[in-house]
Amino acid sequence: MGTGKKEKSRIQRQGKVTGDPKVKGENFYRSAKKIKALNVLKEGKAIRNKEGKVVKAASYQSRDVPTAVIEPNRRWFNNTRVISQDTLTSFREAIAEKDKDPYSVLLKSNKLPMSLIRDGPKDALKKHQAKMTIESEPFSQTFGPKAQRKRPKLSFNTIGDLTEHSEKSMDTYQARLEEIKLLSGASGYGGGLADDDVQEEDFSVATAKEAIFTKGQSKRIWNELYKVIDSSDVILHVIDARDPLGTRCRHVEKYLATEAPHKHLIFVLNKIDLVPSKTAAAWIRVLQKDHPTCAMRSSIKNPFGRGSLIDLLRQFSILHKDRKQISVGLVGYPNVGKSSIINALRGKPVAKVAPIPGETKVWQYVTLMRRIYLIDCPGIVPPNQNDTPQDLLLRGVVRVENVDNPEQYIPAVLNKVKPHHMERTYELKGWKDHIHFLEMLARKGGRLLKGGEPDVDGVAKMVLNDFMRGKIPWFTPAPEKEEGETDTMEGREGRYGEMSKKRKRDEDDSAPATTPASAGEDAKEEDPENFAGFDSDSDSEVEEAAEEKGEEKSTAEDMIPLDASSDEEEDGEEEGSDVEDDEEGSDLDIEGASELEESESEAEAAPAPPPKKQRRSRK
Ligand SMILES: Nc1nc2c(ncn2[C@@H]2O[C@H](COP(=O)(O)OP(=O)(O)OP(=O)(O)O)[C@@H](O)[C@H]2O)c(=O)[nH]1
């Protein structure tokens, strides 16, 4: 016997005609619904009185709720797990420990009850209590003569007072705005800012700054940053090894921790060839407490740390196997070497590198491997009221040629660099103050103005450039070691580092070395394997020379605007990059945005992320 359909066709086939509905097949079995309906009929009809009114309703007509005990069952609450308080506590502790550890990654955190872990029982209780207070406080306690709640102190009682107050504060605000505009050089809007731009600026800073000291703070640059962060799965925060705290951008760290905790943040301590290896190691120790940290010397010919960084990125790409590719964004202060890292990783000049800040104008994509894309971001400077122009200048944020009275920053340079390093670098001795130093230097180099006056301004700019480009050795010592930490700064006296013996020997024997290569020798001496120093024809030197000659610097020849349709270009013939030999494949391409829509001078001190839909996303 088959199913209804089969049975029907069998009957038809055999030519049997049957009127018997009981034959197995269609309608043979009664459904549960039908059985229920039949049972209702069995239970009898309603009892009616003589007049035909219902005295006792039939069971199917009754509206009484039947008394029944339902056995409780955990399965009612779908997808729940019941665990004891102890298990919850130990789970909470274990996960919180993993969550804090920068070296472990919590994948699929959305499947874990993270609110239980993050808020903790006490916080949750407090929140609940606060809510309850608001909800349960009776009207009489809140308002009226017996009110217990404190009244807010308002300086006005009527709506008229309020209007007057707001008008007054608007007037003072405008007056203050005018005053700051005058002080900041944007007076009469002759500072090159359009009327609207000036309106947009946040002049809440306590001290007026020259416009050039707001570089890297414009709304456009911060929009670029948020675009890069949005599009990246891994963020490489590039830090200058000479001033790790100064070039550490805590704003980005905080933003990632609160807004995008699923993105991986890695510190890359760049330019380690310019600091002694022990200092680099000490800073790595400090930084890696917060996030995984890699050390880099970004040179195409002689890089350091390239292999381990590529390995790390590969691990992240394996971690996100489900994705077609991962994007790695490089962010950080201007001139810390973001583009140089990209070039070092690729093993050839693909991104524009220059010894001047603000060379990268817009974000650009570079393919490292088939599954790993790199995104270069323009240098950003988090606005900080405590940062003086001097701090910003010495961090390399500002282009020295644009600075007025550069000699005013020389005392800070002399303060940061050990005197004998200055003496060796410039072969000078016995200056009384910074002006005397500049005059001596100008006379020595024959940099004289009309009438034999020393060109103090020009020499001061040269010294500032030498300071920023690593020609003058300097670095910030790492904080004191904690108990149990082995690496020390022994043998180094004072606040700032000593030159290595080898460098001293070299310089005794020959002319003073004033190149980054020589600064790199410090590290080389201490750890010859790791810190081989830049070659004499290193990037910075080549570029500097090119800059002096007015030549074009190394750039990506084939910069394609981001919006351009060619998303992936095959470029498998390049040499010198073992990245290309990656088993993943070798489709290498570069994309860059060439158009620069807005002027960078539009400084805005509030780098809040724009709404996501406004950011230009590549995805
Ligand atoms: N000595 C040394 N110099 C480096 C290193 N990395 C970069 N530089 C130099 O630092 C300067 C700035 O490098 P860039 O790669 O242009 O820096 P950036 O962060 O991209 O700068 P922006 O375009 O302003 O964002 C260049 O002169 C590089 O040669 C390094 O590891 N060691």
Swiss-Prot record:
| Keyword check for GTP-binding | yes
The UniProt keyword set, sorted, is: GTP-binding, Nucleotide-binding, Nucleus, Ribosome biogenesis
GO CC terms in record: nucleolus
Ranges of compositional bias, category Basic and acidic residues: 1-10, 489-500, 547-556
Q: Where is the composition biased (Acidic residues)?
A: 536-546, 565-603
Domain of life of the organism in this record? Eukaryota
CP-type G domain boundaries: 222-383
**Record's subcellular location:** Nucleus, Nucleolus
Query: Is the keyword GTP-binding in the record?
Result: yes
One short Pfam name that applies is MMR_HSR1
User: Which SUPFAM superfamilies does its entry note?
Assistant: P-loop containing nucleoside triphosphate hydrolases
- A biological process (GO) annotation for this entry? ribosome biogenesis
What is the annotated role of this protein in its UniProt record? GTPase that associates with pre-60S ribosomal subunits in the nucleolus and is required for their nuclear export and maturation.
Q: Which family does it belong to?
A: Belongs to the TRAFAC class YlqF/YawG GTPase family. NOG2 subfamily.
Q: Which PANTHER family match?
A: GTP-BINDING PROTEIN-RELATED (PTHR11089), NUCLEOLAR GTP-BINDING PROTEIN 2 (PTHR11089:SF9)
Name this protein carries in UniProt: Nucleolar GTP-binding protein 2
Organism whose genome encodes this protein:
Neurospora crassa (strain ATCC 24698 / 74-OR23-1A / CBS 708.71 / DSM 1257 / FGSC 987)
> In the UniProt record, what gene is named as encoding this protein?
nog-2
